[in-house]
């Protein structure tokens, strides 16, 4: 009997191994089948569909900039699909811009489109509720004079962390600007002392960085696999951690803000003084229904505002500085303008920056606007999803499920756009849009009746960096003020130059977007 048991034990062990191998093999087959099916779905969705409009350009191009310009030249007044875009992107003529942008979300939705594009399930970027734009438009922008004073104080604190030596030293420009923008934005959104708290800084910056990472990582996978892979990405776990942290931080601040509101509701003067401190939380709560005045909702709103403010503003600011470094002939005219506006205090720690002074820096404003045109973050306006098949007033048919956008960059680079036409004005030579002219918009503003137009924060059908109409970026006035203030500090107190033997980073063009080498360094010294 014992011999029989001795003989059967190896068989049991062998059977166990066989079972494990069989299970592993079945799992492998299942995974392989799922991958094969997902790949088939992906190929079907990314293959060239049968479309009612022409597909323009090289389908294998890394950058779709040339495809867009080519399509605009061939089909300026009719739709075309942008070759190489995923999903296929229908570019519409500007003649239907206002008709499209005035449609309700039930017909044309940016939320549904961005749910896919920005992986809203994991980033929550597409869960922006109406309280955020309402707070920005009605409170933040209206209180800019007071906020600018707060930002200047924060800029003094932030710039103390910049190089202090009068000798040339190499710095990572993007990292330096990222931290500076995060500090200034935090001063407006959460106020002192939280805006300087290292944990809050890392959370607001980290949320921004990880959201971009999630979008880029999941974009490389088939839509079928994204729900399987997404929850396991380290960046997704990081976003959840940042949101939990934000909720914990917001809880006592919400309680304090609600208590202050109740205590001072009848005291208009004190309420106005409280507003002047620039805290975003008390404003935000006024636009939230009572059931959503929770730490989780306010924490999410704060992270969403941080994403919009920190990521885009840092990129825009970094591009402006790089263009100044590459085009040093603009530096002295900008410094001279600063001296004209601020007088001897232009290089003094006691310089007083206010809204009126910022508005008088026409050359700086023009340079910022031209860099935005020359180095856009995207070649098209924010895309939207057609929710119902329809026929537009001029006969253009749109199919349900189609992604649509307008050719912003092609408009900015075309002489057929009136603003960029050589014949736009007889008072000065209007350079081709293919040429960088930092004072282009300074000249345009000199035309009679154009003085209040062509500013860095203004929009129009010929300038779509911030979109246009009711969907124009509500935070653009805050962002441009922030950029100007940081540039004033740089120009007044620092010299900067390219590192020896390095040309400076070139704008990388990928799909419909552009990217910048965030690790590139420049040399700077205290003046």
Swiss-Prot record:
Keywords noted in UniProt: Heme, Iron, Membrane, Metal-binding, Monooxygenase, Oxidoreductase, Transmembrane, Transmembrane helix
Top-rank EC class of the record's enzyme: oxidoreductase
Membrane topology: Single-pass membrane protein
Named cofactor requirement(s): heme
Organism (species): Gibberella fujikuroi (strain CBS 195.34 / IMI 58289 / NRRL A-6831)
Family: Belongs to the cytochrome P450 family.
The enzyme's E.C. designation: 1.-.-.-
Tree of life domain: Eukaryota
Pathway: Plant hormone biosynthesis; gibberellin biosynthesis
Protein name: Cytochrome P450 monooygenase 3
GO MF entries: heme binding; iron ion binding; monooxygenase activity; oxidoreductase activity, acting on paired donors, with incorporation or reduction of molecular oxygen
GO biological process: gibberellin biosynthetic process; secondary metabolic process
Transmembrane region(s): 21-41
Deletion phenotype: Impairs the production of GA3, although its precursors, GA4 and GA7, are present.
Keyword Membrane: yes
Positions contributing to heme binding: 473
Biological function: Gibberellin 13-hydroxylase; part of the gene cluster that mediates the biosynthesis of gibberellins (GAs), diterpenoids that may provide a selective advantage during infection of the preferred host plant, rice. Gibberellins (GAs) are diterpenoids and are synthesized via the mevalonate pathway. Biosynthesis of the major metabolite GA3 (gibberellic acid) from geranylgeranyl diphosphate (GGPP) requires 13 steps.
Subcellular location: Membrane
GO cellular component assignments: membrane
Induction (free text): Expression is induced under gibberellin-producing conditions.
């Amino acid at each position: 009997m014992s011999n029989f048991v001795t003989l059967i034990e190896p068989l049991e062990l062998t059977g166990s191994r066989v079972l494990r191998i069989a299970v592993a093999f079945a799992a492998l087959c299942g995974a392989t089948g799922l991958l094969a099916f997902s790949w088939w779905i992906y190929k079907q969705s990314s293959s060239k569909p049968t479309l009612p409009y022409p597909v323009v350009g090289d389908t294998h191009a890394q950058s779709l900039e040339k495809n867009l310009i080519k399509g605009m030249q061939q089909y300026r007044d009719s739709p075309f699909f942008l070759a190489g875009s995923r999903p296929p992107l229908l570019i519409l003529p500007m003649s239907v811009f206002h008709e499209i942008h005035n449609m309700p979300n039930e017909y044309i939705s940016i939320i549904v489109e961005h749910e896919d594009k920005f992986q809203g399930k994991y980033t929550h970027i597409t869960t922006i509720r109406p309280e955020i734009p309402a707070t920005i438009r009605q409170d933040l922008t209206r209180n800019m004079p007071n906020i600018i004073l707060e930002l200047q104080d924060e800029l003094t604190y932030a710039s103390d962390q910049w190089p202090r030596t009068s000798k040339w030293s190499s710095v990572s420009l993007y990292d330096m600007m990222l931290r500076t923008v995060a500090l200034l934005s935090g001063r407006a959104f959460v106020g002192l002392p939280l805006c300087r708290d290292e944990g809050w800084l890392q959370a607001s910056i980290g949320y921004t960085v990880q959201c971009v990472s999630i979008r880029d990582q999941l974009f490389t996978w088939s839509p079928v696999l994204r729900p399987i892979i997404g929850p396991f990405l380290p960046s997704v776990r990081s976003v959840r951690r940042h949101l939990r942290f934000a909720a914990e931080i917001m809880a006592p601040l919400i309680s304090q803000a609600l208590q202050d509101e109740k205590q001072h509701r009848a005291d208009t003067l004190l309420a106005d003084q409280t507003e002047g401190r620039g805290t975003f939380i008390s404003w935000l709560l006024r636009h939230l229904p009572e059931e959503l005045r929770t730490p989780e909702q306010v924490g999410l709103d704060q992270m969403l505002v941080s994403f919009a403010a920190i990521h885009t503003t840092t990129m825009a600011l970094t591009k402006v500085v790089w263009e100044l470094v590459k085009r040093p002939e603009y530096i002295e005219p900008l410094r001279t303008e600063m001296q004209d506006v601020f007088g001897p205090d232009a290089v003094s720690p006691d310089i007083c920056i206010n809204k009126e002074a910022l508005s008088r820096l026409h050359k700086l404003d023009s340079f910022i606007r031209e860099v935005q045109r020359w180095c856009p973050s995207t070649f098209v306006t924010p895309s939207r999803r057609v929710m119902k098949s329809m026929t537009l007033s001029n006969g253009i048919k749109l199919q349900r499920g189609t992604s649509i956008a307008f050719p912003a960059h092609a408009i900015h680079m075309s002489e057929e756009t009136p603003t960029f036409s050589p014949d736009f004005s007889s008072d000065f030579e209007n350079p081709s849009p293919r040429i960088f002219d930092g004072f282009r918009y300074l000249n345009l503003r000199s035309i009679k009746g154009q003085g209040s137009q062509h500013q860095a924060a203004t929009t129009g059908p010929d300038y779509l960096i911030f979109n246009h109409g009711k969907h124009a970026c509500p935070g653009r006035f805050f962002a441009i003020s922030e950029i100007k203030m940081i540039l004033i500090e740089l120009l007044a107190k620092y010299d900067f130059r390219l590192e020896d033997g390095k040309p400076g980073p070139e704008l990388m063009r990928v799909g419909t977007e552009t990217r910048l080498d965030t690790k590139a360094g420049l040399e700077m010294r205290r003046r």
